[in-house]
Swiss-Prot record:
CHAD domain ranges (all copies): 228-506
Organism: Mycobacterium tuberculosis (strain ATCC 25618 / H37Rv)
Protein name stated in the entry: Uncharacterized protein Rv2226
One cellular component term from this protein's GO annotations in UniProt: cytosol
Record-annotated CYTH domain positions: 11-219
Gene3D superfamilies: CHAD domain, Hypothetical Protein Pfu-838710-001
SMART domains referenced in this protein's UniProt entry, alphabetically: CHAD, CYTH
Pfam family, one: CHAD
Length: 513
């Protein structure tokens, strides 16, 4: 897999599906104010082969991957969930490689399929009659499709002897109603009005999320037979939810979405914090491999994250200064330099996200979640509480006070950073166990000292860049100005810490009552 995979075209699909019987008559859209005319489109014959892993991992994540011929949009289509009635469709053209999935689409879902084979699981043939609904301005508003569907599971169109766990052939009729979106927005009120016409005509909301889901036996989006149930224990449920979030942010990082690297790193550290504070409950040892791997992943993502944060920070600070105070090549060195470092860090992150090492980490996380979901009541360990995590925060706060009284700035900053890390762990554990007020107060400390740590990193970087600028004979006035602003920010954070710690202590005491 290349480090720089091509970016596939994206399209927001907003649609609803409906089940209808053979005798149901297509609806009329007359009388809907937004619709001024309806045009019949040429009949289409669509033939699609759907691809997935042997265990249908894509389908379990409400994702479909198909190679379709026929119609105006023939090609490879990857559809990802994007909210109620919405999916993000990514496309790639057909090629001479036949059933080889395009690299740019496979890369998007690599964290789900990993190194498993992606192979045909179903073939669906659709005879489509469609109508385009137009508005007063002449723009297309929506498309109504009347589909007669014939579908075969994998064994029915593979060579003799291939496995087939479902019926050889299925036939049904369904309607689709899709908004025509050009700017990424959707008029859900219009969709509701149009959908009511379909319901009035005798249709029913589809009992499946997609044609493929119906072939595979799913009755609702993302549901497949024998799918894992969410863990009952709150901490294990929190880990399960964060693993799901990790896969979502993985896709965003691959798309280079803004703040995605940062959020994936945050999610990675949440999982690590929850596992670290619940090692016995998960059957992990102090030096558990999975915890170490999560730390390594966060470190790799941190290169791009730090550069992105610094670049945005310097951009805001420089924009806020009067023009005469921005001297020399300071913007080029601080902002443009951060953006270059971000791209370097992103490439490093993508290499890591395409590695066998990363796939094995994801396998291990899946196993942890699955094992706890199927644990019997006799295997349950003592419930996780906030007590141990809070004791670590208090210990770190006491050490920070000693460091502030006896040591220099470096030791003080390290001690404050330790408080932040332990407050973060307390926050996640408290949130998972229902101690919401404790979680909120811990978040205040985490944010406060996060700003302090960003200031520490920023000042170190400003010194380095000021030295480089001075060596090059450039004006260094602005570097000094920004440095002082960062120092003032750090001082304000330290001044607010004591009050924040008192509020946290009060919240913990109340949670224990």
């Amino acid at each position: 897999m290349p480090v720089e995979a091509p970016r596939p075209a994206r399209h927001l699909e907003v649609e609803r599906k409906f089940d209808v019987i053979e005798s149901t008559v297509s609806p009329s859209f007359e009388g809907i104010a937004a619709v001024v005319r309806v045009e019949q489109s040429p009949t289409q014959q669509l033939d699609a082969v759907y691809f997935d892993t042997p265990s249908h991992d894509l389908a379990r994540n409400q994702i479909t991957l198909r190679r379709r011929t026929g119609g105006a949009d023939a090609g490879w289509h990857l559809k990802l969930p994007a909210g109620p009635d919405k999916r993000t469709e990514m496309r790639a053209p057909l090629s001479a490689s036949g059933d080889a999935v395009p690299a740019e689409l496979l890369d998007v879902v690599l964290a789900i399929v990993r190194d498993q084979p992606v192979q045909p699981v179903a073939r669906i043939s659709t005879h489509r009659e469609s109508q385009i609904l137009y508005g007063a301005g002449g723009d297309a508003l929506a498309e109504f499709c009347n589909d007669d569907v014939t579908a075969w599971s994998a064994g029915a169109f593979h060579a003799a002897g291939a496995a087939d766990n479902g019926p050889a052939e299925q036939q049904w009729r369904e309607w689709e109603l899709e908004l025509v979106t050009t700017d990424g927005t959707a008029d859900t009120k219009l969709l509701d009005r149009l959908a009511n016409r379909l319901l009035d005509a005798g249709a029913a909301p589809a009992g499946h999320g997609s044609k493929l889901a119906r072939v595979l036996g799913a009755t609702s989006p993302g549901e497949l037979p024998n799918g894992p149930q969410p863990p009952a224990d709150p901490v294990h449920r929190a880990v399960s939810e964060q693993v799901e979030q990790l896969l979502l942010w993985d896709r965003a990082v691959r798309a280079d979405a803004y703040d995605a690297v940062h959020q994936m790193r945050v999610t990675t550290r949440k999982i690590r914090s929850l596992l670290t504070d619940s090692q016995e409950s998960f059957g992990l040892k102090e030096s558990a491999w999975v915890i170490d791997e999560l730390r390594e992943l966060a470190d790799v993502l941190g290169v791009a994250r730090d550069a992105e944060v610094l670049g945005d920070r310097y951009q805001r600070e420089l924009d806020a200064l009067a023009p005469e105070l921005v001297r020399g090549r300071v913007r080029e060195r601080l902002v443009d330099g951060a953006r270059r470092r971000y791209q370097t860090g992103l490439r490093r992150s993508l290499i890591a996200l395409r590695s066998q090492r990363y796939f094995r980490l994801l396998d291990a996380l899946d196993a942890l979640v699955s094992e706890r979901a199927h644990a019997t009541s006799g295997e349950e360990s003592a419930p996780v509480t906030i007590d141990a995590a809070y004791r670590r925060v208090r210990k770190a706060a006491k050490a920070a006070k000693t460091a502030g009284d006896q040591a220099g700035d470096h030791h003080r900053d390290e001690a404050l950073h330790l408080i932040r890390k332990r407050a973060k762990r307390l926050r996640y554990t408290a949130a998972a166990t229902g101690a919401d007020n404790v979680s909120q107060e811990a978040k205040v400390i985490q944010t406060l000292l996060g700003d302090h740590q960003d200031s520490v990193v920023s000042r170190e970087h400003l010194i380095q860049q000021a030295i480089a600028a001075n060596t090059a004979g450039e004006d260094t006035f602005t570097y000094g100005l920004l440095y002082q602003q960062e120092a003032d920010l750090a001082e304000r954070c330290r001044e607010q810490l004591e009050a924040a710690l008192r509020k946290l202590d009060k919240a913990v005491r109340k949670a224990r009552d």
